């Protein structure tokens, strides 16, 4: 079925690999329940604090037009994450392990450094989002909030001891909080249903408007997260699979793909709700919505959002922001462990790995916070730069993924079919070109 892989390596996330039993000869729904869970962890990366400002600003500036961009981005994400899960299930290796085995030492070292920096960039967005949420909810000084957020490594260490199913349940709960909050706020905002439906139809207007195109690139560039591709290839292996049994492998691929697509559909709904909220409440206003604090204040200002304005809406927004940040903590930690163990085969205690990654991520945020005396606007600029770097890092994960899943020598009969390969390479090239354009425009090198 696939070529023999290096057996001296330990399994990906060894402590939870194959730890969840799947009932044999069970019905569709019972089997789906057994495979459900990893998709929630994947979906978190598609609704983290780094995506919020772009989606809401897109609605505020261009109403519902950019909903089609969110739809396209979500379809690309579903394709790549399905390939990531397939890779892990068929080979029994994660993307980091395979990349190390199949590249030279120099290339492997470069890819490892980029992957580690991507984890740090993801952490920065989570730290800033959580720190600001704590300030908004409890009036904790931002610097103190950042330090509290940094200490959440202890939370994850406790969760890992409870078992992977418990982690999945906690993340699912946090995702549900985010979904419910924004669904409620959108219902109150009374959006245009016809405008929403029309917004999902791609418009050539986007290509002819520089501001609209720039925001579109931001949405696409922030959608597929590099660390999620490493994560997906690993946590797809948490279910017990007999790789000598073709039917068992095919079943695992099928249900893991369904789980991933279901949860990414939820992420698509959340991102759509963010844009719809921006369109329904802020379109046509002169308010600045480039910061979390601006959005928080606007939701309780009846001169901006009208009669529905209330402190409750603002508080719910901050609660959702905190839930988004904390759920990212879990996935960031697991991704960091996968990357470190896979690329350099360095098995260190989880608390050491997490602490090192966390300190490196907190340091620039803390330095910014102290230097600018807790000025949220300046600190959120760092969040923007972290998202730009994730765009830079994306091809370094996507290209190996497409190559490996298209290899019949590696994947056997489960290699990408011709149409999947064509779609994957097309999506990859589009993502790379869009990200290059976004980076150049962000740096002011093109107008």
Swiss-Prot record:
Swiss-Prot/TrEMBL keywords: Cell membrane, Ion transport, Membrane, Symport, Transmembrane, Transmembrane helix, Transport
Does this entry carry the keyword Membrane? Answer: yes
Keyword set includes Cytoplasm = no
**One Gene Ontology MF term:** metal ion binding
Predominantly, its location class is: membrane
HAMAP family according to UniProt: NRAMP
Q: What is this protein called?
A: Divalent metal cation transporter MntH
């Amino acid at each position: 079925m696939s070529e023999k892989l290096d057996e001296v390596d330990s399994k990906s996330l060894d402590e939870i690999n194959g730890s969840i039993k799947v009932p044999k000869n069970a019905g569709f729904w019972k089997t789906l329940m057994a495979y459900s869970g990893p998709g929630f962890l994947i979906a978190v990366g598609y609704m983290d604090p780094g995506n919020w400002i772009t989606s809401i600003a897109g609605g505020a500036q261009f109403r519902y037009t950019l909903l089609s961009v969110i739809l396209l981005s979500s379809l690309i994400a579903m394709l790549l994450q399905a390939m990531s899960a397939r890779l892990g299930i068929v080979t029994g290796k994660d993307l980091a392990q395979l990349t190390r085995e199949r590249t030279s030492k120099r290339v492997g070292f470069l890819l490892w450094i980029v992957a580690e920096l991507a984890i740090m960039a993801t952490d920065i967005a989570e730290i800033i989002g959580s720190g600001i949420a704590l300030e908004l909810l409890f009036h904790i000084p931002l610097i103190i909030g950042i330090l509290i957020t940094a200490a959440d490594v202890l939370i994850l260490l406790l969760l890992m001891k409870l078992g992977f199913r418990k982690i999945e349940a906690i993340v699912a709960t946090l995702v549900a909080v985010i979904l419910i909050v924004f669904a409620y706020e959108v219902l109150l905002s009374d959006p245009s249903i016809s405008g929403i439906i029309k917004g999902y139809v791609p418009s050539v207007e986007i290509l002819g408007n520089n501001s609209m195109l720039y925001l579109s690139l931001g949405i696409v560039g922030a959608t597929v997260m590099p660390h999620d591709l490493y994560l997906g290839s690993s946590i797809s292996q948490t279910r017990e699979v007999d790789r000598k049994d073709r039917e068992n492998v095919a079943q695992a691929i099928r249900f893991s793909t369904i789980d991933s697509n279901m949860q990414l559909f939820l992420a698509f709904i959340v991102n759509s709700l963010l844009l719809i909220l921006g369109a329904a409440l802020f379109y046509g206003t002169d308010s600045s919505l480039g910061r979390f604090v601006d959005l928080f204040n606007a939701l309780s200002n009846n001169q901006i959002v009208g009669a529905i304005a209330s402190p409750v809406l603002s508080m719910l927004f901050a609660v959702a922001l905190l839930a988004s940040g904390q759920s990212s903590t879990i996935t960031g930690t697991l991704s960091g462990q996968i990357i470190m163990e896979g690329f350099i085969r360095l098995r260190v205690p989880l608390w050491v790995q997490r602490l090192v990654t966390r300190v490196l991520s907190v340091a620039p945020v803390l330095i910014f916070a102290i230097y600018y005396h807790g000025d949220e606007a300046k600190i959120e600029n760092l969040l923007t730069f972290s998202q730009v770097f994730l765009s830079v890092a994306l091809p370094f994960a996507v290209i190996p993924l497409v190559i490996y899943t298209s290899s019949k020598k590696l994947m056997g009969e489960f290699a990408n079919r011709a149409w999947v390969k064509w779609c994957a390479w097309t999506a990859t090239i589009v993502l790379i070109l869009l990200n290059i354009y976004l980076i150049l425009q962000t740096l002011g090198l093109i107008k």
